[in-house]
Amino acid sequence: MFTIDFSDHTGLVKDAWYKQIEDLLEFAKKEEHIEDDAELSVTFVDKQEIQEINRTYRDKDKVTDVISFALEEDEPDIDFSGLDIPRVLGDIIICTDVAQEQANNYGHSFERELGFLALHGFLHLLGYDHMTEADEKEMFGRQDTILNAYGLTRD
């Protein structure tokens, strides 16, 4: 079973939006051929908290929209197939303040921006990145493909 543990430190995220994000990430999981028995967390924070996280764990003293911590990132390939435990993908942390600003700037809903950022963070958990131009093209292309197939567009 695909499990997402949601935590809202801001009180701004409506319960219905959890369902949309869960459905989107379930769709993305299938598109990326991730096994059903996987789990991750999504936490919603304000600017102050995400800046503190960014400073502490990434040595960047600035606000950002989303941060992901992949649990498998630095782990060697370990075969868990014989064990009855879920694959833990990691943690996604979304700044609701920045999400609202970006939604206003792009002319779409706060709800759509939360979905976009959740998917962006999810792809990071799977190993996608945008450090080089080629990686950016691959990641953003995949992101757009999944969003369009799911039906979460900027309109």
Curated annotation (Swiss-Prot):
Enzyme Commission number(s): 3.1.-.-
Family under the similarity heading: Belongs to the endoribonuclease YbeY family.
InterPro entries named among the record's database cross-references: MetalPrtase_cat_dom_sf_prd, YbeY, YbeY_CS
Cross-referenced Pfam families: YbeY (PF02130)
Top EC class, one word: hydrolase
Residues the entry annotates as binding Zn(2+): H120, H124, H130
The UniProt record lists the keyword Metal-binding: yes
GO terms under biological process: rRNA processing
Annotated localization: Cytoplasm
Function comment: Single strand-specific metallo-endoribonuclease involved in late-stage 70S ribosome quality control and in maturation of the 3' terminus of the 16S rRNA.
GO cellular component terms attached to this protein's record: cytoplasm
Protein name: Endoribonuclease YbeY
Cofactor note text: Binds 1 zinc ion.
Gene: ybeY
Cofactor: Zn(2+)
Gene Ontology molecular function: any one: metalloendopeptidase activity
